[in-house]
Amino acid sequence: TNLNDPAYLEALQQAKSISQSRLDEALTDNQLDAIVAPSNGPGWLIDLENGDDGSSVNYVSSSGLAAIAGYPAITVPAGYIDGMPVGISFFGAAFSEPQLIALAFAYEQRTQARRAPELTSVSP
């Protein structure tokens, strides 16, 4: 794909515009400071010999809309599922970074969901 192709650039701008308007509408119409959603699904074990090709992962990212819009998002630890970490993401309007950081920090302090990983030795 040619990244300078006018059709591609137009589609990119259209996707950004639609994403921005949908996020703005959701925040304004519902009088929200932020949208909170689970981050990607739980972490997965990686094949230590062959690496990770991502084929074992089945999830839809909650951060896609904010990323396409160019809007801020922050993810913090939310806990563990089957011993694997999961996160929670906060998305906001354009230039709402200070508010999102404050919300994410308050969530972290209240839940204390983060814990140091338990490292195990791996035999070759």
Label each residue range with its predicted role.
Residues T1-L65, E118-S123:
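Serine-dependent amide/ester hydrolase catalytic core
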